[in-house]
């Protein structure tokens, strides 16, 4: 007799810290064993069901959608989806259960089954070891609701009493008139994952494996067993019943029906006609002189394709969100592939004029691609929440939710969880964590383990590392996407379960952005960008002090002084070109116009670097190499001197040279992005080569293009993205060049953001001769502000007054009370300040320690004394200042002030710490950053500086880039991999770092190639100088 079986009760690793295998592993194993179907029944979640659906499609083995859940004060049950109605019912049930509980938990109540949900089949999993009456009552309760849609699940796992258990379960089923079926309670695809499953169980229960006891399964039988093994335990009729149930479950995720909201369309209009009307209004605003024939044709082409694909409502929704932001004076800008669209530009979603660029609309939408477009919009990072709450208000929480992100285990974190439950002591776990790389999930080598004092051959360490390797990449929990929104015409809970986010007033769906693409749900990304906050604040400050109202659209273009500043790499604080790698490239590329900035933004990226495109481009730009490309491809290559730098160029080459359709070219782009992870690029090699040879191109050229495509890997940068970012790059550079005080002030008020700390931004401003005034309770507001100066140079006639936000641990509400009280009359002493601003002891002491009372009372020692006196008299206050005996206190030393500044403000307006150490350093023949400007190439020397940044790009072959700061400027240090590994503790842990190395000076770019590192942090005597690491 041919045995058949379908597993109806199986958990994937999306039953967090329970399931020990991925959906792909489960489906591949079930297919190998000859199963007829596989149900994925993760506990009260559908978070992994799209991945299971993909695994089902790739293997051809049918997927049954389901979920296991414990009913509060009731039975344990597995619900299986029979049809569309059942799927919607399951989504709603999970949503209700998750929404009524805390993050990561659920509560299913009996009332959730009143009335019984249609379209769901139920497997009852009775607890024979518990209360017999309660078990029987639970079965009766389920039978009353599910009737002929209920089965009793029989799980047998080589227990000592399996025969008796089978008899008891069958008797229970018969007594209630409920059919029985075999089910495996599967937690892993293979027996070999038992150790990992035990480990995850201990992690989940916050115990050790040794102490977990009955929490662990008795054996490894909860895996996908071969049919022969199953037949040893189950009668054939119990196995066959599983297949009959599976055949009833016909639902497929591909059948989901999704509609975008329609309420934005006025009466008498359709979504298509209304989108056209809004687009035409935008055309008149954007192009007051009228459209060129080419642009008109592009607009018509886009509108026709949008209507054909039924994306009109999506565009209307994004337009509505952008219009709300603008109505609230929230700066925003669309980016990414949407910048390829003339319609998006007309609607005000993007700011990139398609007439001034050569962008490819098919990168955004194509007829052949059966996927929705993806529009990303950046908003001011500290006002994005206003936009998010507007969306919730507009559509209701039932129809709008944020996308999830499946947070996964990484190297060190996975090891910590594993080692803890295997009983390693905390000090060993911490030491072992040091041996893990910060930059990859790879396990440490035996050599590295020995370096940190571990014997790689000890059994416990082998076990920890083996289990860690299995756990890396597993989902750990669902978290919230930075801003991906799904909005629906119908309640979202009919499409996907919705649960509470960790943040208040937010809900998330249980799928991530890749899941949404696969099932065809439209998403709009509401993203946060700190630079937009800084630009808007700069515009406001300039308007306040100059009377000039700038916008992104009205800033003067192609400004010579701005490009000269950029070419000097004087770009601290600006957008995108402020990193160490970008600043090293700027003097070599020397941008002169906007498109040069587009290339600059894109060229210092993994794709062009790995594709060996950077140096050929620079050589051609500098006249060191001939610019060559086939004449037929001039429209593709002329703007990048024959070197492909962008995804769109690869697509255009495929279309023009190899006869790809636009949709096929987009498939090439996707294969290019995924080939390193999933393969799939090789079929395009022959297709490209054959097409290009047929059209008269040289074989060498075809091969070179393909190798460059491979080099792009998953890092090919879209030109539309680079162009959108370049707009903000230019705006930030122009403002830094022409309004440096306002720009720096706005950056600090917008912090945290960007690459540099407020201290580094202020030091840069001082090097540019901007006057910085201290925090002073007599003048400072919460934010930093500008104060006029009598200076003939427009770029230097505004001083920055530091705000009370700079004082560590000081609260904004205290600052606002100071502003209100001060507006009535000036403060006269500490008592007056404390009384009228209603400051408690903590707030008053923070002001005194920071020096903010210097102008009102005197130096820090004096201020702290008077504040302490005010606190002693506080019970006697009667609204009148008190008189105190004057006490003479010593002035703080320069060093004491410096330490206090960094401790309380994170910066200093006094001498730079290195200035105080310069004599000591000079005695040891240390060079300063200023000295390096005049020294010849290949000189060996030592420097010392505060570490303000460490970077280790993924494309740098393990090289770490360190930026040091002294009183004159910055020193860029290159630390090769072997030195970084040998001196990792010094490299990562030093605040004041000495570097001995070789100076490399070429084309205006200077680096120090490190040969030895020394930690000089003790010389700082308590300064807390924080670097911005590994950005």
UniProtKB/Swiss-Prot annotation:
The keyword Cell wall biogenesis/degradation is annotated on this UniProt entry: no
InterPro entries linked: DNA_pol3_alpha_NTPase_dom, DNA_pol3_finger, DnaE2, DnaE2/DnaE/PolC, DNAPol_HHH, NA-bd_OB_tRNA, PHP_dom, Pol/His_phosphatase_N
CDD domains (alphabetical): DnaE_OBF, PHP_PolIIIA_DnaE2
Entry keyword set: Cytoplasm, DNA damage, DNA repair, DNA replication, DNA-directed DNA polymerase, Nucleotidyltransferase, Transferase
The encoding gene: dnaE2
Gene Ontology terms describing biological process: DNA repair; DNA replication
GO molecular function annotation: 3'-5' exonuclease activity; DNA-directed DNA polymerase activity; nucleic acid binding
Protein family according to the UniProt entry: Belongs to the DNA polymerase type-C family. DnaE2 subfamily.
HAMAP family reported in the protein's UniProt record: DNApol_error_prone
Compartmental location: Cytoplasm
Organism: Pseudomonas syringae pv. syringae (strain B728a)
EC number: 2.7.7.7
A GO term from the CC aspect: cytoplasm
Top-level class of the enzyme under EC nomenclature: transferase
Name of the protein this chain belongs to: Error-prone DNA polymerase
Reactions listed under catalytic activity: DNA(n) + a 2'-deoxyribonucleoside 5'-triphosphate = DNA(n+1) + diphosphate
Entry function: DNA polymerase involved in damage-induced mutagenesis and translesion synthesis (TLS). It is not the major replicative DNA polymerase.
Any Pfam family: HHH_6
